[in-house]
Amino acid sequence: MCNYQLTDFLPTTKKECELRGWGQLDVILFSGDAYVDHPSFGAAVIGRMLEANGYRVAIVPQPDWHGDYRDFKKLGRPRLFFAVSPGAMDSMVNRYTANRRMRHDDAYTPDGRHGMRPDYPSIVYSKILKQLFPDVPVVLGGIEASLRRLTHYDYWEDKLKKCILCESGADIILYGMGEKNTLQLCRELENGRSIKDVKDIPQTVYLAKKEDIPGGITDTDIVLHSHEECLRNKKAQAENFRHIEEESNKMHAQRLIQGVDHQFAVVNPPYPPMTTEELDAAFDLPYTRMPHPKYKGKTIPAYEMIKFSVNLHRGCFGGCAFCTISAHQGKFVVCRSKESIMREVKQVIAMPDFKGYLSDLGGPSANMYGMHGRNPKACERCRRPSCINPQICPNLVTDHSKLLDIYHAVDALPGIKKSFIGSGVRYDLLLHKSKDEKSNEAARQYTRELITRHVSGRLKVAPEHTSDRVLRLMRKPSFSQFYDFKRIFDRINREEGLNQQIIPYFISSHPGCKEEDMAELAVLTKNLDFHLEQVQDFTPTPMTVSTETWYTGYDPYTLEPVSSAKTPREKLAQRQFFFWYKPEERASIERELRRIGRPDLISKLYDGVHYHGRAHYDPKAIGSSPERTDMREKKRKSFNPNFQPRGFGTVSYTHLRAHETTLHL
């Protein structure tokens, strides 16, 4: 049993600092999340990393931004800087739905309580700190600032906004995964440099006059259209984004410079991908893997979801158009060593309430562990946003052998009854036929072992749509591959006597998607016996190609016009097709099908049965009715008692996938 003392956690109060014998702190970190001392929570990662390098660091979780600002004053003035992060998710995604309605809960807050963070904490916290301590540097990190490092469209305010440094008053952004740039900034300031002079650290963003940019603006820099020009011309914003995304995905990027408010936002290129040893060091820090004792007796939903999970790698080369993982973690997959993974699994086994079931052995995508470019030189020249779309790159090693070895080693540990894969699986990697037969055999073995040993009753996959035209805009594989994978899934279930479900995720109102596409999606998924549950409206979030397409009306790569559903009526007209099986939706769906000239789909959806105001539930359909779902759960051969079918709260699944495994300042 783990018996942790208060001093085993990073301090959050003056008293806790005194218990450690600390006077002035070096860095004070303000976070929009509750403090959970776990490698899936960015404040803990950065805090532990600084602690390991000899710095005195404290965390102020979810400070009260009202009244006299006592939470911002209580730890005094740090020696080096204040660090500000909104938390593991974009604060606006966390607080609002795709329809801009306020959510009623917050998964990163004790007991899911709503209202413990403001809109845009990066801005609110920074302004307060600058008001109270104008001469102390304020450093922004985390997903919110990272994805707002240049001119970006803000869906919640429905306007184009400047680099977040302009509005927040902060001094610098440490974008992406924050271990290296944060530590380097500490060393530079400790050596006596002023924050205004620190302009050479990779993976940082700062504001400067033209004459103050180191080396001046050179031919190797990419000078983007200014913020003011983007306000006048949406096509300029679309053109900008192609450069921004390409430089985010390159091994050796160029410096980006954008004019704004008579100065320039300068984005220094990122560090090279971390090594396995560097990633191990981040995960091997002395985390307690528990919420701070101040939350005793309370439940933090996000922690409950991942407390028995282990992250295997960072980065994702999928390049999905609506996802921010590659923009924040990078395109190149960096894997932990087997030894580091096994150490963490043993820590989980030692947890007092662990019952033998690992809820996830995964990452941003479950089955990219160990995959890399066969020829590293080709990767160094590559600027593709995806290694697997529109086709899988011939240079990509898609061998699942290393991942299988991890699974086997984990499952062989005493105390492990089952390890489940809760992260999304890329079935296009499983179906890929490479020239290496060993790799093909490993993919077949992985597929069978995944289904027979690692599915907690339901396997999550993300086809996202059925229209190949829409899927091309999403950078997702053809829906025909989902058919192929489902046939394999069903066959293995029959052979093994299992009764598992495959749960597909879909998005409506994505740029380029029309009502007719959604109507055909309804027919195709009906024919596959699905009554869809895991669905959502597309939510534009900063720094995705889908968002730029949605806002500008142009594909950033081709500059061809792309239409999008934007008004509530247009979005509802698409979303209703997910729920064709609900009696209250039928009349509206039939009206819409007649309006768009597709009355032929009415008989396909409803089998020619006249509408009598009552739903027809197919007993074979997944999610057909609550009674059917309960019955299946009782019959499951591989039932996971930790499984939470609805995720946590009402946070949209796309953004959970984007952020739930990120570790950042």
What are these regions (language model features)?
Residues 2-24, 34, 239-309:
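N-terminal [4Fe-4S]-dependent radical SAM core
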Residues 30-35, 296-324, 342, 357:
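N-terminal pre-triad scaffold of radical SAM enzymes
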Residues 42, 61-260, 267-268, 272:
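Glycine-rich beta-alpha loop elements in corrinoid/cobalamin-binding modules
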Residues 29, 45, 59, 65-68, ...:
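Conserved SAM/AdoMet-binding glycine-rich loop
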Residues 654-661:
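Conserved small/polar residues in nucleotide/adenosyl-binding loops
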Residues 90-99, 147-149, 179-184, 209-213, ...:
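Flexible glycine/acidic-rich beta-alpha junction loops that bind and position SAM and/or redox cofactors
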Residues 329-354:
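Conserved alpha-helical substructure of the radical SAM core
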Residues 459, 463, 501-503, 508-595, ...:
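Flexible, glycine-rich loop/tail regions that form catalytic "lids" or insertion modules at the edges
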